[in-house]
Amino acid sequence: NLYQFKNMIQCTVPNRSWWHFANYGCYCGRGGSGTPVDDLDRCCQIHDNCYGEAEKISGCWPYIKTYTYESCQGTLTSCGANNKCAASVCDCDRVAANCFARATYNDKNYNIDFNARCQ
């Protein structure tokens, strides 16, 4: 769920607040469209698509589904024992949080003009 995703981000990117990723580029935060502005934005596009796939599992609501995962020390390696939906959502979040840690954060891509740059 989004709260657990926030915690994963804080684990993998401890030097930046999670909310810096909530309105970044064309895909981090609300919806998404157009071409990702950089690698970090591509992480969010992949995460959005991953949640879309998880939603195809009967009764799976990624934004609110809770799951178990191993506590972190800079990288997240395991999602623990979960049912199919929870495992899918956890893996979406784990992959994205680790992707965020590898990608460069460009301040110019925070809070961009969505209508002008993301069509």
UniProtKB/Swiss-Prot annotation:
Top-level taxon: Eukaryota
Co-factor remark: Binds 1 Ca(2+) ion.
Cellular component, GO annotation: extracellular region
Cofactor(s) of this protein: Ca(2+)
Stored CDD domains: PLA2c
InterPro entries listed in its UniProt record: PLipase_A2, PLipase_A2_Asp_AS, PLipase_A2_dom, PLipase_A2_dom_sf, PLipase_A2_His_AS
Tissue: Expressed by the venom gland.
Function: PLA2 catalyzes the calcium-dependent hydrolysis of the 2-acyl groups in 3-sn-phosphoglycerides.
Name assigned to this protein: Acidic phospholipase A2 DE-II
Organism: Naja melanoleuca
